[in-house]
């Protein structure tokens, strides 16, 4: 009886593993559709290196990578916005944008909305410029790491000295 459950579990793992080979993330098919539309598979696309991949490879720490990824995602959102009226690729862009929301924003709609609002501010708008300068000092203060407030460690030599003398 015990062995049958092991065999069934093993078979389940094999079936699920083989299904994983045939399943792709939804964005892969849609990205291929966009590649066709933009002729991104042509050999001249590789001229002068990559736009984003070398940058992502350079930065290994999670915080640094998040900063770079946010700029890259901002670029893609702007690109998709420029082609939002194009019916032939609209589904692909929406699928990829939705997948970015899941992967980058952890499906947090408010976080994505705030991100998009930030990327949509026009730097040529006088009112936006004035507000940005007005908030600059507070923004700079937020960028600074918060001072660490914690307990000081006691010197262990004090305790070691007592043990040695006893």
From Swiss-Prot:
Molecular function terms from GO: cytokine activity; type II interferon receptor binding
Keyword Signal appears in the UniProt entry: yes
Pyrrolidone carboxylic acid PTM positions: 24
GO cellular component, one term: extracellular space
Family annotation (SUPFAM superfamilies): 4-helical cytokines (SSF47266)
Keyword ATP-binding belongs to the record: no
Residues with glycosylation annotation: 48, 86, 120
Top-level taxon in the UniProt lineage: Eukaryota
Tissue specificity as recorded in UniProt: Released primarily from activated T lymphocytes.
Localisation: Secreted
GO biological process terms held by the UniProt record: adaptive immune response; defense response to virus; humoral immune response
Signal sequence range: 1-23
Keywords: Antiviral defense, Cytokine, Glycoprotein, Growth regulation, Pyrrolidone carboxylic acid, Secreted, Signal
PANTHER family: INTERFERON GAMMA
Oligomeric and partner information: Homodimer. Interacts with IFNGR1 (via extracellular domain); this interaction promotes IFNGR1 dimerization.
Family: Belongs to the type II (or gamma) interferon family.
Job of this protein: Type II interferon produced by immune cells such as T-cells and NK cells that plays crucial roles in antimicrobial, antiviral, and antitumor responses by activating effector immune cells and enhancing antigen presentation. Primarily signals through the JAK-STAT pathway after interaction with its receptor IFNGR1 to affect gene regulation. Upon IFNG binding, IFNGR1 intracellular domain opens out to allow association of downstream signaling components JAK2, JAK1 and STAT1, leading to STAT1 activation, nuclear translocation and transcription of IFNG-regulated genes.
Protein name: Interferon gamma
Organism: Saimiri sciureus (Common squirrel monkey)
């Amino acid at each position: 009886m015990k062995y049958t459950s092991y065999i069934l579990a093993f078979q389940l793992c094999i079936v699920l593993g083989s299904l994983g080979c045939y399943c792709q993330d939804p964005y892969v098919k849609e990205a291929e559709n966009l590649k066709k539309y933009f002729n991104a598979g042509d050999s001249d696309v590789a001229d002068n290196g990559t736009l984003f991949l070398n940058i992502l490879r350079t930065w290994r720490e999670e915080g640094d990578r998040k900063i770079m990824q946010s700029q890259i995602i901002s670029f893609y959102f702007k690109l998709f916005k420029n082609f939002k009226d194009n019916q032939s690729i609209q589904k692909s862009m929406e699928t990829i944008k939705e997948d970015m929301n899941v992967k980058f924003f952890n499906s947090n709609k408010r976080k994505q909305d705030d991100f998009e609002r930030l990327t949509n501010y026009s730097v040529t708008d006088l009112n936006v410029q004035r507000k940005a300068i007005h908030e600059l000092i507070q923004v700079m203060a937020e960028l600074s790491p918060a001072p660490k407030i914690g307990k000081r460690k006691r010197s262990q030599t004090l305790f070691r000295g007592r043990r040695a003398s006893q």
